[in-house]
Amino acid sequence: MHVRDHNLAFKRRGLLLTLLVGGLALGMSAVGLSGCSQGVAAPSLQLPPLPYSQNALEPYISQKTVEFHYGKHHLAYVEKTNELIKGTNLAQLSLGEIIKQTAGSPDKAAIFNNAAQAWNHNFYWQSLKPGGGKPEGELLTKIQASFGSVENLKKQLQDAATTQFGSGWAWLVADGDKLKVVKTGNAENPMVQGLTPLLAIDVWEHAYYLDYQNRRADYVKALIDNLLNWEFAAANLPKA
């Protein structure tokens, strides 16, 4: 074969390979992350994109903290969950369903811990918003009915997040028609107690240590006063 013919054949093979790969990618895109068709492997859990840029929470949370917290810790929980559920029936489920099905099972503790931490972090990033805001409408009415005032709610959140011993979370939750502040240790999630999370504050040290060192109370106050996403909380209220 002449060199020219050889080059043409090589180019044809390259074109066919490109079309094949493109077709596979298109097919995978059509399946999506919400489900899988018969004979197609279950989609893996993904790290959701942040709802803002990595420096958007400054000066209260630095870009460096977000890079480590989101890009290292949060990602690791997602990847470990995928590793642990691969090839099991759990691989077909959402994070929320995985949490509910593994809660309280000692033999599935590793799956629960990683799945819950992945879910908790998804929720935490959405619980924050550059510039924060104020509770309004139905949420404000429920806060006043449950706590007396927004300031009383903020004080309870501050106390819960600051006094949580060791790693964990502070939450604003709905319990039926009433709102409550609860705290959970390690990876625990209020959903397994039948509560509806509205907002979350991460008090694991990786959430604040680069910026605040051991001053957890300062970190918590900065979030409550400047970054809490009250619109997100309102959207999470149980529907009547």
Short names for language-model regions:
Residues H2-G23:
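N-terminal secretory signal peptides and thylakoid transit peptides that target proteins
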Residues L17-C36:
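Gram-negative bacterial Sec-dependent N-terminal signal peptides
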Residues V31-L57:
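C-terminal segment of N-terminal export signals and the immediately downstream linker at the start
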Residues A56, S62-G87, A91:
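Early transmembrane hairpin module of multi-pass membrane proteins
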Residues P59-H73, G96-W119, N186-N189, Q193-I201:
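Alpha-helical scaffold segments that form or flank carboxylate-/histidine-based iron centers
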Residues V78-Q92, P106-L139:
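Conserved alpha-helical segments that form or flank metal/cofactor-binding pockets of metalloenzymes
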Residues D159-N214, V220-E231:
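An amphipathic alpha-helical core segment
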